[in-house]
C-alpha cells in the first residue's frame, strides 16, 4: 500500500459574526432566495446563518446527503454551539434543507457537535463519527446512527448511551483531538479510522480499530506524524485506482491490485470526500470562508460557501491527484459563446461578450508559440508560491511568457478586476508553469481581504506548447482549474462596481510575446435551487 500525503491549505478571514434572518436582505421571498451581497447562484450555502466544514457526505437510497458544520442561531462560528446541518439532493446541483441532523444535547457533546464523517456499515446503516466537546470542554469522539436506514431522507439520528466511544487520550496535549475520518473495513474484519491529535507537540494521525463500531482500540503507531504543525485538521484516508478515473469504496484494499491509498492532511479544516456507489467516483467537498468584514456578514445574515463538488482521481503517472467539477454542473449551462484561433498580442485585452459573466463557466486553451524565446529565467529562491504570486505574478506586471489568462468580475473601467492567469519560467532547460489568482484589485472596498494565491502546475508545456484553464464564476465565488485539474485555486471576491448586471469578462496577455486562444467556450449558468423553501418537493418527485 502506497501513501500520498498532499498538504492542503486555505486562506480565510477569521472575523466571524452574527445576525438574525429577520433583518437580512437575502431572506427567502416567496420561497426563492434573493442574490444580494455576494450570495451565490449555483454553489451550496444555507439559506441563512453560519456553515463551515463538510462533515459526512454520502449517497444513500438514491439521494445525496450532505452534512456540515452549522450554527442554527446565527452566522458566527464562536457563539452558539455547532450542530450538523443536513441537506439532500438528487443531482448534486439542487438542494433541500432538512434542518439539523445532530445537536449538542448530551453530556458528551453539550458544548458542540464538531467535525467528523459518515460511514455506511455492513447492512446499509449509515453512522456518524464525530468530535464532541463535553461538559468540561474536552474533545472526545462519539458515534450516532441513522434511526431508520430505510428512510430515504435519513431525518432521525440516535446517539447510543455508550458515548463517548473514545475518551481523551493521556498523551494528547492542548485539547487537540478531533475530526474522525470515514471508517474502512480491513481484510481482518476490523473497522479502522483516523483521528487528528497533537502528541508531543507534533500533529499526528492516530489510527483506531474496532470490531463493532462501538469499542475502539488505538494502534501503537500513528499513520502519519509531522512536527511542522501541532494538529492535522480533518484528515482523510481513501483509495484511488492507479489506472483510469474510477473512484473506489473506502474499504478497497491495495495488495497489488492497482490501488493506491491517499492520506489527505491539512493545516486547516477544509475538505471531505465520499465514494458514490453505482457511479464509481470519489467526490470531494471544500468549504470556502468569507473574506469580508464583520459588518458585512452581520448585515447579510449568512457566512460560508461550499465549492462545487469535485470528482477526484489519480493522474496517468500515478503521482498527482486531479480535481474537476462533477459532470452534473453542465446541466446548468445555458447560453454559450466561443472563440477559436484568436491571437492576443503583448498587452492585449479581449472582452468576451454575450453571457452574464457574473454567473458563468469558462473553459479556455492557450497556446504559446514562442515559448523558447520568451520565457524568463526562474530563480531557485522562488519557493513560496504565495510570495511569488504577490511579487512576480501580479496581473498588472509584465513578463516574458505571461502573465496571461482571464480577468473576471471586472467593472467597466477595470478599476475592479480579479485575474486568473499563468506565467511560464525557464530553469536549466526545463519550464515551470505558475498559476495565480490575484485579488489585489478585486474590490474597491477597504474592509475585505485581498491577496494573491498561486501554485505550480505540473504539466509538460514544452511538449504541448499549450495549457488549459477552467474558471467557475458565481458572484462572490471563483474556482479555477489549471492544466486539467492539476492546480486548483478557490477564492471569494466582493466587488462594489462589478455588480451582477455590469460585470465584464476578458482574455488578457501581459507577456512580451503573442499568446493564442486556440479554443474558448463560455456558458451562462442557470440559478440552481439551493436550500430554498420549495426544493424538497422537487427533489423527492424526481
From Swiss-Prot:
UniProt note on tissues of expression: Expressed in roots and leaves.
Enzyme Commission number(s) from the entry: 3.2.1.26
Keywords for the protein's UniProt record, in alphabetical order: Apoplast, Cell wall, Disulfide bond, Glycoprotein, Glycosidase, Hydrolase, Secreted
UniProt: substrate binding residues: 50-53, 69, 77, 114-115, 178-179, 233
Induction remarks: By rice blast fungus (M.grisea) 48 hours after infection. Down-regulated by sucrose in excised leaves.
GO process annotations (BP): carbohydrate metabolic process
SUPFAM superfamilies cross-referenced by the UniProt entry: Arabinanase/levansucrase/invertase, Concanavalin A-like lectins/glucanases
Covalent S-S links between cysteines: 389-436
Reactions listed under catalytic activity: Hydrolysis of terminal non-reducing beta-D-fructofuranoside residues in beta-D-fructofuranosides
Any one GO MF annotation of this record: beta-fructofuranosidase activity
Keyword Disulfide bond: yes
Matching InterPro entries: ConA-like_dom_sf (IPR013320), Fructan_Metab_Enzymes (IPR050551), Glyco_hydro_32 (IPR001362), Glyco_hydro_32_C (IPR013189), Glyco_hydro_32_N (IPR013148), Glyco_hydro_beta-prop_sf (IPR023296)
One Pfam family, short name: Glyco_hydro_32C
Glycosylation sites: 142, 510, 516
Domain of life: Eukaryota
Residue numbers annotated as active site: 53
Cell location: Secreted, Extracellular space, Apoplast; Secreted, Cell wall
Cellular component per GO, a single term: apoplast
UniProt-listed PANTHER family: BETA-FRUCTOFURANOSIDASE, INSOLUBLE ISOENZYME CWINV1-RELATED (PTHR31953)
Function per UniProt: May play a role in stress response.
Recorded family membership: Belongs to the glycosyl hydrolase 32 family.
Protein's name in the database: Beta-fructofuranosidase, insoluble isoenzyme 5
The organism of origin for this protein: Oryza sativa subsp. japonica
Gene symbol of the encoding locus: CIN5
Amino acid at each position: 500500500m502506497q501513501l500520498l500525503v498532499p498538504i492542503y491549505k486555505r486562506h480565510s478571514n477569521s472575523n466571524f459574526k452574527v445576525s438574525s434572518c429577520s433583518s437580512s436582505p437575502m431572506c427567502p421571498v416567496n420561497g426563492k432566495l434573493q442574490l444580494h451581497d455576494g450570495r451565490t447562484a449555483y454553489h451550496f450555502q444555507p439559506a441563512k446563518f453560519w456553515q463551515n466544514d463538510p462533515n459526512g457526505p454520502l449517497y444513500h437510497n438514491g439521494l445525496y446527503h450532505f452534512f456540515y458544520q452549522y450554527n442554527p442561531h446565527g452566522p458566527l462560528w464562536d457563539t452558539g454551539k455547532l450542530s450538523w446541518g443536513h441537506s439532500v439532493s438528487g443531482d448534486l446541483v439542487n438542494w433541500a434543507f432538512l434542518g439539523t441532523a445532530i445537536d449538542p444535547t448530551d453530556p458528551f457533546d453539550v458544548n458542540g457537535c464538531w467535525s467528523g464523517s459518515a460511514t455506511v456499515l455492513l447492512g446499509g446503516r449509515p453512522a456518524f463519527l464525530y468530535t464532541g466537546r463535553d461538559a468540561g470542554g474536552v474533545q472526545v469522539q462519539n458515534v450516532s446512527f441513522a434511526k431508520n436506514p430505510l428512510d430515504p431522507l435519513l431525518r432521525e439520528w440516535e446517539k447510543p448511551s455508550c458515548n463517548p466511544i473514545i475518551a481523551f487520550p493521556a498523551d494528547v496535549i492542548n485539547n487537540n483531538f478531533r475530526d474522525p475520518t470515514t471508517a474502512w473495513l480491513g481484510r481482518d474484519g476490523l473497522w479502522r479510522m483516523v483521528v487528528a491529535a497533537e502528541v508531543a507537540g507534533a500533529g499526528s494521525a492516530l489510527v483506531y480499530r474496532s470490531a463493532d463500531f462501538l469499542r475502539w482500540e488505538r494502534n501503537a503507531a500513528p499513520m502519519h506524524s509531522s512536527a511542522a504543525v501541532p494538529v492535522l485538521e480533518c484528515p482523510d484516508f481513501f483509495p484511488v485506482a492507479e489506472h483510469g478515473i474510477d473512484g473506489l469504496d473506502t474499504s478497497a484494499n491495495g495488495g497489488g491490485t492497482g490501488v493506491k491509498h491517499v492520506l489527505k492532511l491539512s493545516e486547516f479544516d477544509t475538505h471531505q470526500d465520499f465514494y458514490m456507489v453505482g457511479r464509481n467516483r470519489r467526490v470531494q467537498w471544500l468549504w470556502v470562508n468569507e473574506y469580508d468584514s464583520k459588518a458585512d456578514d452581520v448585515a447579510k445574515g449568512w457566512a460560508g460557501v461550499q465549492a462545487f463538488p469535485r470528482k477526484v482521481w489519480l493522474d496517468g503517472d500515478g503521482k498527482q491527484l486531479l480535481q474537476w467539477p462533477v459532470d452534473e454542473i453542465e446541466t446548468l449551462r445555458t447560453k454559450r459563446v466561443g472563440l477559436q484561433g484568436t491571437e492576443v498580442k503583448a498587452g492585449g485585452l479581449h472582452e468576451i461578450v454575450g453571457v452574464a459573466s457574473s454567473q458563468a463557466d469558462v473553459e479556455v486553451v492557450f497556446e504559446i508559440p514562442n515559448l523558447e524565446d520568451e520565457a524568463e529565467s526562474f530563480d531557485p529562491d522562488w519557493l513560496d508560491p504565495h510570495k511569488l504570486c504577490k511579487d512576480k505574478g501580479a496581473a498588472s506586471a509584465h513578463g516574458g511568457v505571461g502573465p496571461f489568462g482571464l480577468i473576471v468580475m471586472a467593472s467597466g473601467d477595470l478599476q475592479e478586476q480579479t485575474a486568473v492567469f499563468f506565467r511560464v519560467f525557464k530553469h536549466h532547460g526545463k519550464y515551470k508553469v505558475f498559476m495565480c489568482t490575484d485579488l489585489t484589485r478585486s474590490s474597491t472596498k477597504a474592509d475585505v481581504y485581498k491577496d494573491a494565491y498561486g501554485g505550480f502546475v505540473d504539466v509538460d508545456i514544452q511538449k504541448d506548447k499549450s495549457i488549459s484553464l477552467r474558471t467557475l464564476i458565481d458572484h462572490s465565488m471563483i474556482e479555477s482549474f489549471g492544466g486539467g485539474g492539476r492546480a486548483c485555486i478557490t477564492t471569494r471576491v466582493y466587488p462594489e462596481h462589478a455588480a451582477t448586471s455590469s460585470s465584464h469578462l476578458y482574455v488578457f496577455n501581459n507577456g512580451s510575446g503573442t499568446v493564442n486562444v486556440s479554443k474558448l467556450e463560455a456558458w451562462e449558468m442557470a440559478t440552481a435551487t439551493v436550500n430554498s423553501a420549495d426544493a424538497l418537493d422537487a427533489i423527492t418527485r424526481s
